[in-house]
């Protein structure tokens, strides 16, 4: 089995079908990487729909991710509806735990797992979409030494997700879709020294994997807030901002695993009423 040197994790939401089609068309077949995609779809979406659409634009094999599958270089793996897509070193994991940012699959979950497993050899890409899923996952990649790429908001059909990332962190590249293939290929030709991801990134990835689900693990991440989780009714912890100054997003998590940005928490609470 040909293991990739890099992993490329991609998140898209509204407008994502066209953006992902153009993105995959830019990818170079010779790059030493595997690609993982989360696009927000309804729970009843047909799993093969996005895979078949993207396969029209690339010679790289596209497939719906399956639990326990070994990761192969040059393959594009797509999150199935209603399942979190996570990666460990060389292995795909599908998770059926709580939604994050009101989504399963969640972009943040995929990006955080890539940061925990591949650190400096994780490349995060945020494309068109509404609201802010993907921002904290991109911060996890940044904190772990990986590379952060966002679609130029002027190039995005829905610029919210790229703008949210740009508002909350410094990225390595803010570029148009047509420029991404060449930039990504250049990154995959490097050999960055691997490092260990921050403890908080690893803990949150383990929560999504359901490896740890308890008060002690969540309490290591922040302080108990006055808010209740709108999904399960349990307490919410406000996640501490990182001491390295990179983590600047206000967000919350319960011990079950539900996670919200501040914006998503407000939306979810308003839906309850």
Predicted regions and their residues:
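Conserved acid/base catalytic micro-environments in cytosolic active-site loops
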Residues: 1-273
């Amino acid at each position: 089995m040909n293991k990739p040197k890099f992993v490329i994790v991609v998140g898209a939401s509204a407008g994502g079908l066209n953006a992902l089609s153009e993105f995959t068309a830019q990818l170079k077949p010779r790059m030493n990487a595997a690609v993982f995609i989360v696009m927000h779809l309804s729970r009843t979406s047909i799993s093969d729909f996005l895979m078949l659409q993207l396969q029209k634009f690339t010679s790289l094999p596209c497939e719906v991710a399956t639990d326990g599958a070994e990761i192969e270089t040059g393959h594009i793996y797509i999150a199935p509806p209603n399942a979190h897509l996570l990666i460990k070193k060389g292995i795909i994991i599908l998770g059926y735990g709580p939604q994050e940012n009101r989504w399963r699959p969640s972009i943040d979950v995929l990006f955080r797992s890539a940061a925990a497993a591949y650190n400096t050899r994780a490349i995060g890409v945020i494309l068109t979409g509404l609201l802010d899923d993907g921002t904290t996952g991109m911060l996890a990649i940044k904190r772990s030494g990986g590379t952060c790429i966002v679609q130029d908001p002027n190039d995005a059909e829905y610029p919210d997700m790229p703008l949210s990332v740009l508002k909350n962190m410094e990225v390595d590249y803010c570029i148009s879709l047509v420029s991404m293939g060449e930039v990504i290929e250049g990154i995959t030709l490097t050999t960055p020294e691997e490092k260990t991801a921050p403890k908080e990134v690893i803990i949150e990835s383990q929560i999504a994997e359901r490896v740890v689900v308890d008060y002690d693990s969540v309490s290591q991440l922040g302080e108990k807030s006055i808010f209740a989780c709108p999904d399960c009714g349990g307490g919410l912890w406000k996640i501490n901002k990182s001491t390295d100054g990179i983590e600047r997003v206000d967000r919350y998590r319960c011990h079950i695993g539900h996670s919200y940005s501040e914006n998503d928490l407000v939306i979810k609470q308003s839906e309850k009423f």
